[in-house]
Amino acid sequence: MRHRMIVLVAVCCLSLFTQCQTAEELVDKNIQAKGGMEKIKAIHSLHMTGKLTGGGGFTAMVTQDSMRPNLVRETFSLQGMTGVQAYDGAVGWQIQPFGGHKDPELMGEDDVRGLLRDADFDGPLVDYREKGNTVEYLGHDVVDGDDALRLKVTLKNGDILYYYLDPDTYLEIRKEIQEFIRGSIRENVVDLGSYKPVAGVMYPFSIASGPKNRPNAAQTTTIEKIDVNAPLAKSEFELPASLRQGASAKPDAEKH
Protein backbone atom coordinates (compact mmCIF):
# COMPACT_ATOMS: atom_id res chain seq x y z
CA MET A 1 0.00 0.00 0.00
CA ARG A 2 2.73 2.42 1.02
CA HIS A 3 4.67 1.57 -2.16
CA ARG A 4 1.62 2.33 -4.31
CA MET A 5 1.15 5.68 -2.55
CA ILE A 6 4.78 6.63 -3.19
CA VAL A 7 4.43 5.75 -6.86
CA LEU A 8 1.17 7.73 -7.10
CA VAL A 9 2.73 10.80 -5.50
CA ALA A 10 5.73 10.56 -7.83
CA VAL A 11 3.50 10.33 -10.88
CA CYS A 12 1.40 13.29 -9.73
CA CYS A 13 4.50 15.40 -9.08
CA LEU A 14 5.88 14.56 -12.51
CA SER A 15 2.54 15.44 -14.10
CA LEU A 16 2.35 18.80 -12.32
CA PHE A 17 5.95 19.60 -13.25
CA THR A 18 5.50 18.90 -16.94
CA GLN A 19 2.17 20.73 -17.07
CA CYS A 20 3.98 23.86 -15.89
CA GLN A 21 6.40 23.61 -18.78
CA THR A 22 5.66 25.60 -21.92
CA ALA A 23 6.23 24.75 -25.56
CA GLU A 24 9.01 27.33 -25.67
CA GLU A 25 10.79 25.75 -22.70
CA LEU A 26 10.55 22.27 -24.22
CA VAL A 27 11.92 23.50 -27.54
CA ASP A 28 14.84 25.13 -25.70
CA LYS A 29 15.50 21.91 -23.76
CA ASN A 30 15.39 19.88 -26.97
CA ILE A 31 17.92 22.18 -28.61
CA GLN A 32 20.20 22.02 -25.56
CA ALA A 33 19.87 18.22 -25.49
CA LYS A 34 21.06 18.06 -29.07
CA GLY A 35 24.17 20.06 -28.23
CA GLY A 36 23.08 23.68 -28.04
CA MET A 37 22.43 26.33 -30.65
CA GLU A 38 26.08 27.30 -31.08
CA LYS A 39 27.19 23.78 -32.02
CA ILE A 40 24.13 23.23 -34.20
CA LYS A 41 24.77 26.45 -36.15
CA ALA A 42 28.47 25.60 -36.52
CA ILE A 43 27.52 22.77 -38.90
CA HIS A 44 27.04 23.96 -42.47
CA SER A 45 26.87 20.71 -44.42
CA LEU A 46 26.21 17.01 -43.78
CA HIS A 47 27.00 13.81 -45.64
CA MET A 48 25.17 10.75 -44.29
CA THR A 49 25.47 7.16 -45.47
CA GLY A 50 23.54 4.12 -44.34
CA LYS A 51 21.46 1.07 -45.15
CA LEU A 52 17.70 0.86 -45.57
CA THR A 53 15.93 -2.41 -44.82
CA GLY A 54 12.40 -2.77 -46.11
CA GLY A 55 9.57 -5.25 -46.23
CA GLY A 56 10.57 -8.57 -47.72
CA GLY A 57 14.08 -8.21 -46.37
CA PHE A 58 15.59 -6.14 -49.17
CA THR A 59 18.51 -3.86 -48.29
CA ALA A 60 19.48 -0.69 -50.13
CA MET A 61 22.33 1.77 -49.69
CA VAL A 62 21.19 5.31 -48.98
CA THR A 63 22.89 8.69 -48.75
CA GLN A 64 21.78 12.18 -47.82
CA ASP A 65 23.78 15.32 -48.59
CA SER A 66 22.53 18.63 -47.22
CA MET A 67 23.77 22.20 -47.04
CA ARG A 68 22.56 25.41 -45.46
CA PRO A 69 20.15 26.96 -45.83
CA ASN A 70 17.88 24.47 -47.62
CA LEU A 71 19.67 22.22 -50.10
CA VAL A 72 19.28 18.44 -49.99
CA ARG A 73 20.09 15.46 -52.22
CA GLU A 74 19.12 11.88 -51.36
CA THR A 75 20.07 8.67 -53.16
CA PHE A 76 18.72 5.12 -52.98
CA SER A 77 20.82 2.35 -54.58
CA LEU A 78 19.52 -1.16 -55.20
CA GLN A 79 20.34 -3.89 -57.74
CA GLY A 80 22.79 -1.71 -59.65
CA MET A 81 20.39 1.21 -60.02
CA THR A 82 20.39 4.52 -58.13
CA GLY A 83 17.40 6.77 -57.59
CA VAL A 84 17.90 10.45 -56.80
CA GLN A 85 15.72 13.09 -55.20
CA ALA A 86 17.04 16.62 -54.73
CA TYR A 87 15.93 20.12 -53.83
CA ASP A 88 18.03 23.06 -55.02
CA GLY A 89 16.47 25.71 -52.80
CA ALA A 90 13.65 26.41 -55.23
CA VAL A 91 12.65 23.28 -57.15
CA GLY A 92 12.52 19.55 -56.42
CA TRP A 93 13.67 17.04 -59.03
CA GLN A 94 14.27 13.30 -59.21
CA ILE A 95 15.59 10.35 -61.19
CA GLN A 96 13.61 7.13 -60.64
CA PRO A 97 15.14 4.29 -62.70
CA PHE A 98 13.17 1.67 -60.76
CA GLY A 99 10.03 2.79 -62.56
CA GLY A 100 11.76 3.02 -65.91
CA HIS A 101 12.42 6.77 -65.63
CA LYS A 102 16.15 7.19 -66.25
CA ASP A 103 15.97 10.88 -67.14
CA PRO A 104 15.62 13.70 -64.58
CA GLU A 105 12.09 14.95 -63.99
CA LEU A 106 10.48 17.64 -61.89
CA MET A 107 8.73 16.59 -58.70
CA GLY A 108 5.07 17.44 -58.20
CA GLU A 109 3.78 19.53 -55.32
CA ASP A 110 2.60 16.49 -53.34
CA ASP A 111 5.74 14.42 -53.89
CA VAL A 112 8.12 17.21 -52.87
CA ARG A 113 6.63 17.77 -49.40
CA GLY A 114 8.84 15.26 -47.61
CA LEU A 115 11.92 16.53 -49.41
CA LEU A 116 11.16 20.09 -48.31
CA ARG A 117 11.08 18.91 -44.68
CA ASP A 118 14.46 17.22 -45.17
CA ALA A 119 15.78 20.43 -46.74
CA ASP A 120 15.15 22.32 -43.49
CA PHE A 121 18.75 21.93 -42.33
CA ASP A 122 18.18 22.34 -38.57
CA GLY A 123 14.66 20.91 -38.47
CA PRO A 124 11.38 22.72 -37.76
CA LEU A 125 12.00 23.42 -34.06
CA VAL A 126 15.14 25.53 -34.50
CA ASP A 127 14.18 29.16 -35.25
CA TYR A 128 10.60 27.94 -35.67
CA ARG A 129 9.03 31.40 -35.46
CA GLU A 130 11.26 32.81 -38.18
CA LYS A 131 10.26 29.86 -40.39
CA GLY A 132 6.56 30.56 -39.90
CA ASN A 133 5.98 27.43 -37.79
CA THR A 134 3.91 27.30 -34.60
CA VAL A 135 4.53 24.97 -31.63
CA GLU A 136 2.06 23.81 -28.96
CA TYR A 137 2.67 21.59 -25.93
CA LEU A 138 -0.07 18.95 -25.70
CA GLY A 139 1.03 17.29 -22.45
CA HIS A 140 1.91 13.66 -21.75
CA ASP A 141 1.49 10.70 -24.05
CA VAL A 142 2.77 7.13 -24.21
CA VAL A 143 5.14 5.71 -26.84
CA ASP A 144 5.60 1.93 -26.75
CA GLY A 145 4.72 1.88 -23.06
CA ASP A 146 7.03 4.74 -22.09
CA ASP A 147 6.14 8.27 -21.03
CA ALA A 148 6.68 11.04 -23.59
CA LEU A 149 6.11 14.78 -23.92
CA ARG A 150 4.03 15.68 -26.98
CA LEU A 151 4.58 18.77 -29.11
CA LYS A 152 2.41 19.82 -32.04
CA VAL A 153 4.30 21.65 -34.78
CA THR A 154 2.24 23.29 -37.51
CA LEU A 155 4.39 24.09 -40.52
CA LYS A 156 4.00 27.17 -42.67
CA ASN A 157 2.41 25.07 -45.44
CA GLY A 158 -0.25 23.72 -43.04
CA ASP A 159 1.18 20.23 -42.54
CA ILE A 160 1.41 19.05 -38.92
CA LEU A 161 4.19 17.22 -37.08
CA TYR A 162 3.71 15.67 -33.66
CA TYR A 163 7.01 15.32 -31.80
CA TYR A 164 7.33 12.96 -28.85
CA LEU A 165 10.21 13.86 -26.53
CA ASP A 166 11.86 11.59 -23.98
CA PRO A 167 11.12 13.30 -20.61
CA ASP A 168 14.61 12.46 -19.35
CA THR A 169 16.75 13.42 -22.36
CA TYR A 170 14.34 15.75 -24.23
CA LEU A 171 15.40 14.14 -27.51
CA GLU A 172 12.79 13.10 -30.09
CA ILE A 173 11.81 9.45 -29.92
CA ARG A 174 8.90 9.59 -32.35
CA LYS A 175 7.52 11.91 -35.01
CA GLU A 176 4.07 11.68 -36.56
CA ILE A 177 3.49 13.48 -39.84
CA GLN A 178 0.15 14.69 -41.18
CA GLU A 179 0.13 15.95 -44.76
CA PHE A 180 -3.04 17.54 -46.12
CA ILE A 181 -3.30 16.69 -49.80
CA ARG A 182 -6.29 17.62 -51.95
CA GLY A 183 -8.78 17.24 -49.12
CA SER A 184 -7.30 14.03 -47.69
CA ILE A 185 -4.79 13.33 -44.93
CA ARG A 186 -1.64 11.26 -45.43
CA GLU A 187 -0.13 10.09 -42.12
CA ASN A 188 3.29 8.59 -41.43
CA VAL A 189 5.18 7.65 -38.28
CA VAL A 190 8.95 7.94 -37.74
CA ASP A 191 10.66 6.32 -34.73
CA LEU A 192 14.07 7.72 -33.80
CA GLY A 193 16.75 6.09 -31.66
CA SER A 194 20.40 5.10 -31.13
CA TYR A 195 21.47 8.73 -30.72
CA LYS A 196 25.18 9.45 -30.98
CA PRO A 197 27.16 12.71 -30.81
CA VAL A 198 28.83 13.93 -33.99
CA ALA A 199 30.83 17.17 -33.66
CA GLY A 200 29.01 17.75 -30.38
CA VAL A 201 25.51 17.41 -31.87
CA MET A 202 23.22 14.44 -31.21
CA TYR A 203 21.90 12.56 -34.26
CA PRO A 204 19.65 9.48 -34.43
CA PHE A 205 21.41 6.54 -36.08
CA SER A 206 18.26 4.39 -36.22
CA ILE A 207 15.22 5.69 -38.13
CA ALA A 208 12.14 3.53 -38.71
CA SER A 209 9.39 5.04 -40.85
CA GLY A 210 6.17 4.01 -42.51
CA PRO A 211 2.43 4.67 -42.86
CA LYS A 212 0.57 5.13 -39.59
CA ASN A 213 -1.30 2.02 -38.40
CA ARG A 214 0.63 -0.17 -40.85
CA PRO A 215 3.68 -1.37 -38.87
CA ASN A 216 4.40 -4.16 -41.36
CA ALA A 217 5.09 -1.53 -44.01
CA ALA A 218 7.79 0.23 -41.96
CA GLN A 219 11.30 0.63 -43.33
CA THR A 220 14.36 0.98 -41.11
CA THR A 221 17.35 3.13 -41.98
CA THR A 222 20.56 2.45 -40.06
CA ILE A 223 23.00 5.33 -40.36
CA GLU A 224 26.58 4.11 -40.70
CA LYS A 225 28.46 7.39 -40.89
CA ILE A 226 27.85 11.13 -40.64
CA ASP A 227 30.42 13.61 -41.93
CA VAL A 228 29.90 17.19 -40.77
CA ASN A 229 31.01 20.22 -42.78
CA ALA A 230 31.72 17.89 -45.68
CA PRO A 231 33.11 19.63 -48.80
CA LEU A 232 29.93 19.56 -50.87
CA ALA A 233 29.39 21.58 -54.04
CA LYS A 234 26.14 23.41 -54.79
CA SER A 235 26.25 21.92 -58.27
CA GLU A 236 25.35 18.54 -56.73
CA PHE A 237 21.90 19.88 -55.87
CA GLU A 238 21.25 22.00 -58.94
CA LEU A 239 18.47 21.23 -61.36
CA PRO A 240 19.85 19.36 -64.39
CA ALA A 241 20.14 21.50 -67.51
CA SER A 242 17.50 19.44 -69.30
CA LEU A 243 14.91 20.58 -66.74
CA ARG A 244 15.81 24.24 -66.22
CA GLN A 245 13.62 25.62 -68.97
CA GLY A 246 10.55 23.79 -67.68
CA ALA A 247 11.24 24.74 -64.08
CA SER A 248 11.37 28.44 -64.92
CA ALA A 249 7.69 28.27 -65.81
CA LYS A 250 6.69 26.55 -62.53
CA PRO A 251 5.98 28.33 -59.21
CA ASP A 252 8.64 28.17 -56.52
CA ALA A 253 8.13 24.94 -54.57
CA GLU A 254 8.44 26.81 -51.29
CA LYS A 255 5.26 28.72 -52.03
CA HIS A 256 3.08 25.59 -52.05
Where are the predicted features?
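Bacterial N-terminal signal peptides that target proteins for export
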Residues: M1-V7
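N-terminal mature ectodomain segment of secretory-pathway/periplasmic proteins
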Residues: E24-G100, G132-G139
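Flexible, processing/modification-adjacent segments and terminal tails
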Residues: C20-V27, I31-Q32, K39, V91-D159, ...
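Alpha-helix boundary/capping detector
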Residues: L52-G57, D118, I177, A218, ...
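Gly/Pro-enriched, hydrophobic low-complexity segments
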Residues: M81, D144-L239
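Bacterial N-terminal signal peptides
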Residues: V7-L16
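Short amphipathic beta-strand/extended segments with alternating polar/hydrophobic composition
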Residues: M61-D65, Q85-G89, D103-D111, L165, ...
